[in-house]
């Protein structure tokens, strides 16, 4: 239907009113993705109005939005964050009333109707997609886009924001090399990723980390220590560990949630706990570096800008064709619609038996298993 696929280059002659919503943790390329949707709609629909629902689902619940114009999407391709704000609204609380007893799901449906929306375009990660699917089940027209630096959304090979975060985490590891070598220290670089290790795995390989610890492969502390001692025996004065914030030892994986929480309270994070254990067993000097939220910030890398533009254009095509209830994903470098019901509630984790793990081990990276 769009001019991209029509020989006459004409526009569709009907009104579309679309609401944009960004939810969950921010990341690079949110703005670039919204721009891709908006520019395609403006280019191919005669009469389109876009509103920005402010601060994620909170705006949809409490009725906060602003009208957006083509000018609002100018110059944001390289801008990090989100021009309409975001917030975290846990899915498990969505069906519970707020502190004033208001039915949140009913409120979202009412505002959708009140604003006379034809469709919601929702950008977010796992929790966001659960709520988006809930809204689909409630009869709202929804198209979603896969946002997360964790790259753990089911149904897509890649999420926007991931590659930009890989670049930042890799740079942190790169910059540690010289100081680690100069002082002969063991450095732990803690990378974001509570449940999955895609970011740590890619940054660890790209940054030349000696040891990579991810949630999907519980580690044996003694094997981590052995890997460090082996490097020392080989005359290598330093070691660098890339550790996911959700990494866990085999011993701790056996603990109850209560006992694990109690143990973790003694340390700021997993890296500090692991660092203390390594220092005790090796006698080496340990330093911890936590890039933290810098991994979410800054300008999106060129790769993210490209896939965001492509994803956005295809999302707009679905809206024009009135094909709702889909996430727009990437499969074998092609942009494809994936039924939202097949995505919500599922996580794409690193397979410990996958080729990338085997290849990393082949070059000598230790995973502590």
Which sequence ranges carry the predicted segments?
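Accessory alpha-helical/coil subdomains and C-terminal extensions
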Residues: 111, 122-124, 130-134, 162-183, ...
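Short, small-residue-biased leader/transition segments that mark boundaries at the very start
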Residues: 1-4
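Short glycine/serine/threonine-rich phosphate/pyrophosphate-binding segments
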Residues: 26-37, 60-61, 105-106, 117-133, ...
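A cross-family phosphate/adenosyl-ligand binding-site feature
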Residues: 14-22, 33-118, 123, 127, ...
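Short, acidic/small-residue loops that bind anionic groups at enzyme active sites
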Residues: 45, 135-159, 214-220
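A glycine- and small-aliphatic-rich helix-loop capping segment at beta-alpha/alpha-beta transitions
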Residues: 35-44, 67-72, 134-144, 160-164, ...
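Short beta-strand elements at the ligand-binding edges of bilobed clamshell
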Residues: 155-166, 299-305
């Amino acid at each position: 239907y769009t001019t991209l696929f029509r020989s006459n280059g004409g526009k569709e002659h009907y009104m579309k009113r679309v609401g944009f919503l960004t939810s969950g943790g921010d990341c690079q390329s949110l703005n670039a993705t919204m721009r891709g949707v908006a520019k395609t709609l403006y280019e191919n629909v005669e009469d389109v109005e876009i509103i920005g629902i402010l601060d994620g689902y909170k705006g949809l619940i409490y009725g906060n939005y602003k009208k957006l114009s083509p000018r609002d999407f100018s110059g944001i391709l390289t801008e990090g964050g989100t021009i309409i704000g975001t917030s975290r609204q846990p899915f498990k609380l969505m069906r519970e009333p707020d502190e004033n007893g208001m039915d949140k799901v009913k409120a979202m449906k009412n505002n959708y109707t009140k604003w006379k929306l034809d469709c919601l375009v929702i950008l977010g990660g796992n929790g966001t997609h659960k709520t988006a699917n809930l809204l689909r089940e409630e009869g709202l027209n929804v198209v979603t886009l896969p946002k997360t630096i964790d790259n753990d959304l089911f149904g897509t090979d890649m999420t926007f924001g991931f590659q930009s975060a890989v670049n930042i985490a890799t740079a942190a590891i790169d910059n540690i090399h010289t100081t680690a070598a100069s002082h002969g220290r063991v450095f732990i670089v803690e990378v974001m990723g509570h449940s999955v290790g895609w970011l740590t795995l890619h940054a660890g390989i790209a940054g030349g980390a000696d040891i990579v610890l991810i949630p999907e492969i519980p580690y044996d502390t003694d094997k981590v220590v052995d890997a460090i001692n082996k490097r020392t025996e080989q005359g290598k004065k330093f070691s660098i560990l890339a550790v996911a914030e959700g990494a866990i030892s085999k011993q701790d994986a056996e603990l109850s949630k209560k006992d694990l929480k109690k143990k973790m309270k003694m340390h700021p994070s997993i890296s500090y706990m692991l660092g203390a254990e390594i220092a005790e067993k090796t006698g080496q000097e340990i330093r911890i570096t936590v890039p933290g939220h810098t991994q979410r910030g800054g300008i999106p890398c060129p790769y993210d800008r490209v896939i965001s533009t492509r994803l956005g254009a295809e999302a707009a095509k679905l809206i024009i064709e009135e094909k709702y209830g889909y996430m727009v994903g990437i499969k074998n470098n092609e942009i494809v619609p994936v039924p939202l019901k097949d995505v919500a509630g599922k996580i794409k984790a690193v397979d410990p038996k996958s080729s990338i793990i085997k290849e990393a081990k082949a070059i000598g990276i230790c995973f502590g298993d």
